[in-house]
Amino acid sequence: MTEQKLSDNERLKRESNFLRGTIADDLQDRITGGFTADNFQLIRFHGMYQQDDRDIRAERAKQKLEPLHNVMLRARMPGGIITPTQWLAIDKFAEESSLYGSIRLTTRQTFQFHGVLKPNIKLMHQTLNSIGIDSIATAGDVNRNVLCTTNPIESELHQEAYEWAKKISEHLLPKTRAYAEIWLDGEKVEGGDEEPILGSNYLPRKFKTTVVIPPQNDVDVHANDLNFIAIADNGKLVGFNVLVGGGLAMTHGDKTTYPRRADDFGFIPLVNTLEVAAAVVTTQRDWGNRSNRKNAKTKYTLDRVGVDVFKAEVEKRAGITFEASRPYEFTDRGDRIGWVEGIDGKHHLALFIENGRLLDTPGKPLKTGVAEIAKIHKGDFRMTANQNLIVAGVPAADKNKIEKIARDHGLIDDGVSEQRKNSMACVAFPTCPLAMAEAERFLPDFVTDVEGVLAKHGLAEDDNIILRVTGCANGCGRAMLAEIGLVGKAPGRYNVHLGGNRNGTRVPKMYRENITVPQIMDEIDQLVGRWANEREDGEDFGDFTVRTGIIEPVLVSKRDFYA
């Protein structure tokens, strides 16, 4: 690190007394519905973001009222597994104690509560704690929720991978007692807080980790700082290939920021997993940029110091030498919607949840439907990184019962197209303070329009496009790994990126900047027309746009993304 002035977030963390700040005092202040000064940032380390309802912000200002401050909470659920008992408890809390009455499944393979007012925040944490859930470190400059491929078919392998996701999450978790003290009325103990892995100033920026079972890339490895690719021998997990330095966030107009693929460091046996995880995190802790938060993520550290230098430091700290990577291949990222049978004879029902939003609407009481399933289900639920929900471990005798509940509540709809199943958006308006354009509320009608274009050009149901919309350049909707990625620029305007591929191993490049939705549809119409007429046999849309020179491929992000 060069000696530059540290960002103010570094002061904030240093002075926070291991993430306590004055959050407890702020909770008692009912003059404002929000958190003040440093606490606005510090609550992120406890899994919350302060938000407000942007649909009514101007009206409240007219009435001389502050914005309707509330928090969004993101739960820590390594691997996305939740029991029916836990589900019924979160369903009840969302219904009774949040402004929107919904549960939002997210691209981080967990659930979010939106619209929780200050008087209900402590109740929320205590409710979660009573069912064995917390939200420690799901936001802020820490290792966040650890993702794991939801592979219900290879049940034994999935169980092993899931156990590692949990172990990695626990190993990298903050050790401060602040969460228990503030939210769970834990006993205050003077001194003694230590953070051997994260350090007293925590990480320079957010850090994301996955465990993935090829050939499924449902967790999108290249969106994450640290990835453990499961390598199996005769169905048994023997170790991991380690990929480091992925990430999708960027800043509009700042060409020192860009999405980037992760680099393959090599193979490690299982016994070295936790040491390597800690070594990658501590190297980024010590070498990451603490002066400019826009360049603070692991991907920029790798590009600044060099992949080989970073890798050698990880080897030194972990006391290992990476072996050559073992062969693997990604073939798909989508969830297998519908029923599948695992090798253990259990059945699993993957439900497509558009945008991950579980809410009761006229004719589609989705949230109630999942709760009704939870009342009789003997297995567990698995949230996916594609914002869907798997009813897992269903005995053959219960299949018909569970399918009937799902159909009666609109959770199974045979009319949903493959295109819709392969489309995704982040939350954006009205709750996300960073959103520049609509995403979740925009996507359903946009997909309908794209379906019309595909039909117009005579394309079959299987001929669909990985389509993603994100409301700003931070990339929660993972548009920077889509075949067509829309990035919000202003209300009704988006940058359009082309050239990603179906298995999520290529970053798309900007094709059109700051254009309106009608202009976007014109562009898609022309592009799909060309694809239908000029493609090679079975050629996917993203590969077609690269092969025909419509867009140049991004091979090295730092060099190619803006070229």
From Swiss-Prot:
Cofactor binding note of this UniProt entry: Binds 1 siroheme per subunit.
EC number, as in UniProt: 1.8.1.2
PROSITE patterns the record matches: NIR_SIR
GO CC annotation: sulfite reductase complex (NADPH)
Signal peptide: none
Residue numbers binding [4Fe-4S] cluster: C426, C432, C472, C476
Matching InterPro entries: CysI, NiRdtase/SiRdtase_haem-b_fer, Nit/Sulf_reduc_fer-like_dom_sf, NO2/SO3_Rdtase_4Fe4S_dom, NO2/SO3_Rdtase_4Fe4S_prot, NO2/SO3_Rdtase_4Fe4S_sf, NO2/SO3_Rdtase_FeS/sirohaem_BS
UniProt binding sites for siroheme: C476
Highest rank taxon of the organism: Bacteria
Pathway the protein contributes to: Sulfur metabolism; hydrogen sulfide biosynthesis; hydrogen sulfide from sulfite (NADPH route): step 1/1
Keywords, comma-separated and alphabetical: 4Fe-4S, Amino-acid biosynthesis, Cysteine biosynthesis, Heme, Iron, Iron-sulfur, Metal-binding, NADP, Oxidoreductase
GO molecular function: 4 iron, 4 sulfur cluster binding; heme binding; metal ion binding; NADP binding; sulfite reductase (ferredoxin) activity; sulfite reductase (NADPH) activity
Reactions it catalyzes: hydrogen sulfide + 3 NADP(+) + 3 H2O = sulfite + 3 NADPH + 4 H(+)
GO biological process: cysteine biosynthetic process; hydrogen sulfide biosynthetic process; sulfate assimilation
Pfam families recorded: NIR_SIR, NIR_SIR_ferr
Needed cofactors: siroheme; [4Fe-4S] cluster
Function: Component of the sulfite reductase complex that catalyzes the 6-electron reduction of sulfite to sulfide. This is one of several activities required for the biosynthesis of L-cysteine from sulfate.
Assembly with partners or alone: Alpha(8)-beta(8). The alpha component is a flavoprotein, the beta component is a hemoprotein.
Family: Belongs to the nitrite and sulfite reductase 4Fe-4S domain family.
Family annotation (PANTHER family): SULFITE REDUCTASE [NADPH] SUBUNIT BETA, SULFITE REDUCTASE [NADPH] SUBUNIT BETA-RELATED
HAMAP family: CysI (MF_01540)
Name of the protein in question: Sulfite reductase [NADPH] hemoprotein beta-component
Source organism per UniProt: Photobacterium profundum (strain SS9)
